[in-house]
Amino acid sequence: MSPKVLAVFVLCAILVVVMAGRTGTETGGNKKDTLQDLKKRTRNCFDRFEKGTCKMAKRNGACEWSDKYEMNCKKTCGLC
């Protein structure tokens, strides 16, 4: 291998490693939404799940420990 090809290969490898370490930073990479982000974006107060499902979740206390029911049964769980 010629030194130029080897140098290009090494520089590309360094670039890949650096960019892989920057995901989710100020560059707007692959940042996953947190529960707080979803709550901020969800302004309407309604239940996405069926009425019976939300009532069962409230009766079993799932509104307090389950993020799934907390986000999808807002009205029944009394979160808005």
From Swiss-Prot:
Residue ranges of every copy of the ShKT domain listed in the record: 45-80
Family stated for the protein in its record: Belongs to the sea anemone type 1 potassium channel toxin family. Type 1b subfamily.
Protein name as annotated: U-actitoxin-Avd9c
Native source species: Anemonia viridis
Any single GO CC term annotated in Swiss-Prot or TrEMBL for this entry: nematocyst
Places the protein is found: Secreted; Nematocyst
Source organism, top-level taxon: Eukaryota
Residues annotated as signal peptide: 1-20
Maturation-removed propeptide residues: 21-38
Summary of the function given for this chain in its UniProt record: Inhibits voltage-gated potassium channels (Kv1/KCNA).
